[in-house]
Amino acid sequence: GGEMSSVRVEKNGAVTTVILDRPHARNAVDGPTAMALFEAFTEFDADESASVAVLWGEHGTFCAGADLKAIGTSDSNPVHRPRVGVTAPGPMGPSRMVLSKPVIAAVSGYAVAGGLELAVWCDLRVAEEDAVFGVFCRRWGVPLIDGGTVRLPRLIGHGRAMDMILTGRAVAADEA
């Protein structure tokens, strides 16, 4: 469409910064955004001059997850059935990819639902003091679609993960 791309990539030496920029949707990921993220990380992985990527959300929000409005209204959102051996973008974009280089999530504002999955998919998370992590999709009855429920327990321990997944409560940065 005619709208600006919701993903910007800035290269600075060996560091590639992938920036989510959909202020009107609090950086929620719709179909085109998922594709753009997928392409950005595919290029980063193939770029020999790049050694680390930083995933960053513009406008004080990391990512509010999958764009439920877009998913609800869009006919152009095919269901991805990844063929075996093909790295197809998941609903959140790169979260099924396995990269050969580290990705750092620079989280400020909200990293909730699918946004939390993107943060968990990254190898390292750097949280600003105002960061809020949460599995908010529990409140809307949308399960974590892209491996988040598998990764979260490995990362923060099963008990805490179940607490976040079952209650959908928000966790402030100092607790995270």
Model regions and ranges:
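Hydrophobic/aromatic residues within transmembrane alpha-helices
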Residues: 18, 55, 67, 118-120, ...
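An acidic, glycine-rich surface segment that forms the CoA-thioester-binding/catalytic face
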Residues: 34-38, 42, 46, 68-108
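Short, active-site-adjacent cap segments at secondary-structure transitions
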Residues: 60-64, 69, 112, 134
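Crotonase-fold acyl-CoA enzyme core
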Residues: 94-175
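Short, Asp-centered acidic motifs that coordinate Mg2+ and/or phosphate
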Residues: 52-54, 78-79, 104, 124
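Conserved CoA-thioester-binding segment of acyl-CoA-metabolizing enzymes
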Residues: 2-58, 74
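Short, flexible helix/strand-to-coil boundary loops that buttress conserved ligand/catalytic motifs
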Residues: 29-30, 66, 75, 137, ...
